[in-house]
Design a protein with these regions (language model features):
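Acceptor-substrate binding/catalytic loop of class I
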Residues: 145-162
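Conserved class I S-adenosyl-L-methionine
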Residues: 1-43, 46-55, 144
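Conserved S-adenosyl-L-methionine
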Residues: 171-182
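Conserved beta-strand signature within the Rossmann-like core of class I S-adenosyl-L-methionine
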Residues: 134-142
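A short acidic, Gly/Pro-enriched loop at the edge of an enzyme's catalytic core
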Residues: 99-108
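A short SAM/SAH-binding and catalytic strip from SAM-dependent methyltransferases
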Residues: 108-120
Length: 197
């Protein structure tokens, strides 16, 4: 078993090359493109976006329309890049940040391949449901035993958890770990919030 390090330390070191890795064919990062495809297909063109574990804010390059972005990330170095893309930033762990955000405060909430780093994903998803006014896109990674054992940051497999009210819910080949070469299947989930008017 590998020695584990904090997610913040790992992602701070990764920040400068993160965009290149996402675009690298060997990483085959399909989950972000798939999320953008789902979102664009549902004709959302403006509003506020909460991007959970936003990294460098790469998502903003893929969405078609006028959006105000806020990103949560544990890595201050990642958030520096997101800020250059116009993101408002929240530098906190996902669990802490979500608990502090007001209900119905963002139109659209994205949480892409980041809940693998959160032990209590069910509570995070409850907060996401509380925060989103219009739609939610979540991707859950099917982390393999080999990946969980060998990745330097502690990770979990939440890919089989029950998700209520999903309009779309399917698996894709999500991405290949740039450090381990392990391919991870990703469950893509699209939820439209019921209007409370």
């Amino acid at each position: 078993m590998s020695t584990k390090i904090a997610a913040e330390e790992f992602y701070d070191k990764f920040a400068a090359t993160y965009d290149e890795v996402l675009k690298d064919p060997s990483c085959n990062a399909q989950h972000v493109n798939e999320a953008a495809k789902i979102f664009n297909r549902h004709n959302h063109h403006q509003g506020s976006v909460l991007d959970i574990a936003c990294g460098t804010g790469f998502l903003s390059e893929l969405l078609e329309g006028e959006f105000d972005y806020t990103g949560i990330d544990i890595s201050s170095k990642m958030l520096d890049y997101a800020a250059q893309r116009g993101y408002k930033t929240i530098h906190k762990p996902i669990e802490t940040a979500l608990a502090e955000i007001d209900s119905k405060s963002y139109d659209f909430v994205f949480c892409l391949s980041s809940l693998l780093c959160v032990e209590d994903a069910a509570t995070a998803i409850k907060h996401i449901n509380r925060i989103a006014r219009k739609t939610i896109i979540i991707s859950l990674d099917e982390t393999t035993e080999e990946y969980m054992k060998n990745f330097v940051v502690p990770v979990y497999d939440h890919s089989k958890m029950a998700i209520e009210n999903a309009m779309e819910d399917y698996f894709i080949m999500g991405w290949t770990s740039p450090t381990l070469g392990i391919t991870i299947r990703t469950r893509m989930i699209y939820i439209e919030q019921k209007s409370s008017e």
